[in-house]
């Protein structure tokens, strides 16, 4: 079984929630909106990383009219070119959201396919049923990846400044070397290095 970085992030977010933490995910990937909940907030980067847009469960419902969990179904319907997920031809965000507001999930949509209005939409859904389900599966972030570490193992600790100084010096990473706090340098305050 293969997992993506999204799956690791989703699993860690879920573990954090289960341990009573408030979780914040910072990403440029809108796929993460499916992870928003009462305890998980998603910050979407804008214009590089200079602006962040905050999404929690309530904002997603207000803005899109669907729940975070339904974003998986939306991706199944409309696909995602950036992730090579095909979706159903002719179904974009607007139509996908409309269908999910009416039917809730892809599964319920197909159970009630005769109630779908719009001849072209219904025909495309029928013709591309397997693609819709495959796209949903591909778009879902897995939140139960078996991890061999705990959240405590992932805590950020004080760097090994001496080792970093050694590596940066050897590789001549002068700009990184200059960022080591002076009181952590082996030469205590001397950032003047000569390289030949």
Identify the meaning behind each predicted range.
Residues 1-147:
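Extended two-metal-dependent nuclease catalytic cores across DNA- and RNA-processing enzymes
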Residues 152-159:
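Cytoplasmic/organellar membrane-interface segments at the starts of transmembrane helices
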Residues 160-196:
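Long, highly charged low-complexity segments
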């Amino acid at each position: 079984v293969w997992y993506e970085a999204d799956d690791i992030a989703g699993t860690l977010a879920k573990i954090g929630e289960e341990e009573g933490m408030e979780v914040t995910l910072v990403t440029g990937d809108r796929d993460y909106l499916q992870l928003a909940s009462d305890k998980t907030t998603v910050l979407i980067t804008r214009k590089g990383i200079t602006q962040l847009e905050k999404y929690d469960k309530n904002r997603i419902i207000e803005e899109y009219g669907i729940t975070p969990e339904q974003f998986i179904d939306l991706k199944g319907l409309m696909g995602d070119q950036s992730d090579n997920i095909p979706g159903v031809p002719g179904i974009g965000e607007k139509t996908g959201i409309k269908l999910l507001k009416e039917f809730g999930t892809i599964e319920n949509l197909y159970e009630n396919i005769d109630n779908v209005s719009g001849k072209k939409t219904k025909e495309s859904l029928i013709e591309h049923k397997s693609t819709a389900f495959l796209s949903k599966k591909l778009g879902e972030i897995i939140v139960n990846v078996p991890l061999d570490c705990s959240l405590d193992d992932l805590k950020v600790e004080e760097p090994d400044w001496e080792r970093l100084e050694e590596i940066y010096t050897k590789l001549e990473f002068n700009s990184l070397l200059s960022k080591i706090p002076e009181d952590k340098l082996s030469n205590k305050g001397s950032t003047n290095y000569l390289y030949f």
